[in-house]
Amino acid sequence: MGSLVTPNEIINPSKQDLTIRSESVKKGLIPYWDRDEVNYLIDRVANHEHQMLLRFLWMSGVRVTEAVSLRKQDIDLQNAVMRVRWLKSRKYQERVVPIHPRLVDLLRLYTATLKAEDRVFPITRQRAWQITKKHLGGKTHKLRHSFAVNWLRSGCDLTPLHRILGHSKIQTTMEYTKIVPVDQGKELIKVVF
């Protein structure tokens, strides 16, 4: 089997984790995994529920607390969107997040037997963190970072990413451009004068 990582990024079999890229640590960048690394790590998870939770976090970019509070009725598979709620300053906030077509298919199968009011992942956030620690070395938010980096590497715009991640300030989302610089010249070509 070919290696997906360099020797500096070798897999630690005891922790089932990839180390943070040395160049991102040196530069003080946000730690992340690239697409192949994340998929490799998640594909190795034998427990179907654990694998689905990790894949959902990776493919949606939502926070753990948002994922574990999600109910089947919050997901609109027909229109490939979900309503995500989170608590901020003692008030619930809500945003609509698009769902990738591949994740729509996975959710359709995974939620088929659930009632509308059932939680998709009926666990606590602490249990979700334990699952992440077991399979990824405890780096739950690194899946969210990986989603954002993958989004930008795919050539998608920063503004929708800002909305999907639910950041209150665009400056927070712009931290990802230190890893994947946004080509503003390419964006200018899209503008019609």
What kind of region is each of these model predictions?
Residues 31-64:
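Basic, Lys/Arg- and aromatic-enriched nucleic-acid-binding interface segment
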Residues 66-67, 138, 148, 155-169, ...:
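Active-site-proximal segment of tyrosine recombinases
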Residues 100-141, 147:
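Active-site/catalytic core of tyrosine-dependent DNA strand-transfer enzymes
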Residues 44, 56-57, 70, 150-154, ...:
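Short alpha-helical segment immediately N-terminal to, or the first helix within
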Residues 1-23, 59-65, 131:
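N-terminal DNA-binding recognition helix of tyrosine site-specific recombinases/integrases
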